[in-house]
């Protein structure tokens, strides 16, 4: 789990969230330039037509992190997270190597605050994108407060700094007043041209903590006390779901504890609905099947459920054997 980072991009409408996500996927080689199309994560026709994000689209990117070059990781915008107290400060300086960056590109329009809040629950951090010419807008504030309520690490990013209308000093001051961060913590980028986007990828690894399994930490403590290691039940948060005419109900989940293997008998803890995990995997950004979903990972589960009412957003998926 030390090489997993779960994060989202939050901002006001039209401040460049989807464009930044596109650049990240290009730089990490998740999508080739030949297959790239503008605002790739905005899968609905209406989204591309109107230029807004409605449906959450998670994607896993493989990023090779190196420790050379650049300043030491900043902690000024690192909000105190419950995982720090749970794992006893286990989230230390990142080690060089391959990292899984799990991105959820969230809506920025005022009407979709519920979609933002449910995606934040699946993350440890957020990239806050602010238009360098428009500054902090009302919806930006609303989303930042949602992130603060979830105790997420926040990485401030000023976008569109290459435009003539950009007022970097003024908007930087707004961000500093909002987050209480240093000016050096703010990354100045142009998502359209790709300027300084590699710095954002580095900051995600350096400033956002790795996921932690709360039940695994408790099990370790119990084992240290009495020498017995209890079993860890599987728990996965559903942050989105939809019905596919050919495959049934498909869930987007964040695995909090345990694992979900392909073929497992699963149960929804709130509704009591039971089903089968016909296929599990991650999205890069298309579905890529895996043998199982591990702790801390974000991915999908293809089920044999017939309606999304059986697997509601915010419900917890567990294995049948833990619910009997």
Give a label for each model feature.
Residues 126-183:
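Conserved C-terminal guanine-recognition region of P-loop GTPase G domains, centered on the G4
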Residues 12-15, 25, 109, 131-135, ...:
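Short, ordered loop/turn segments at secondary-structure junctions
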Residues 23-24, 115-118, 122, 139-146, ...:
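Alpha-helical scaffold elements adjacent to nucleotide-binding pockets in ATP/GTP-utilizing enzyme cores
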Residues 66-99, 213-231:
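Intrinsic disorder/low-complexity segments
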Residues 1-68, 98-130, 136, 143, ...:
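P-loop NTPase switch module centered on the Walker A-proximal segment
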Residues 179-217, 225-324:
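Conserved catalytic-core segments of large NTP-driven translation/proteostasis enzymes
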Residues 6-9, 19, 23, 155, ...:
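Hydrophobic regular secondary-structure detector
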Residues 33-35, 111, 137-138, 163-169, ...:
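Switch/connector loops and helix/strand junctions flanking conserved nucleotide-binding motifs
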